[in-house]
Amino acid sequence: IFGAILPLALGALKNLIK
């Protein structure tokens, strides 16, 4: 489960940083 949430959270963070 975490394996799927990790990339999702990373993508959201990258979007915020961008």
From Swiss-Prot:
Record PTM Lysine amide, positions in chain: K18
Task of the protein: Has antibacterial activity against the Gram-positive bacteria S.aureus ATCC 25926 (MIC=8 uM), E.faecalis ATCC 29212 (MIC=16 uM), and B.subtilis ATCC 19659 (MIC=8 uM). Has a less potent antibacterial activity against the Gram-negative bacteria E.coli ATCC 25922 (MIC=32 uM), and P.aeruginosa ATCC 27853 (MIC=64 uM). Has antifungal activity against C.albicans ATCC 90028 (MIC=16.7 uM), C.krusei ATCC 6258 (MIC=16.7 uM), C.parapsilosis ATCC 22019 (MIC=67 uM), and C.neoformans ATCC 90012 (MIC=33.5 uM). Has hemolytic activity against human erythrocytes (HC50=18 uM).
Tissue expression summary: Expressed by the skin glands.
Entry keyword annotation includes Calcium: no
Keywords noted in UniProt: Amidation, Amphibian defense peptide, Antibiotic, Antimicrobial, Cytolysis, Fungicide, Hemolysis, Secreted
Entry GO terms, CC: extracellular region
Domain of life from the UniProt record: Eukaryota
GO BP terms, alphabetized: defense response to bacterium; defense response to fungus; killing of cells of another organism
Subcellular location: Secreted
UniProt protein name: Hylin-a1
The organism of origin for this protein: Boana albopunctata (Spotted tree frog)
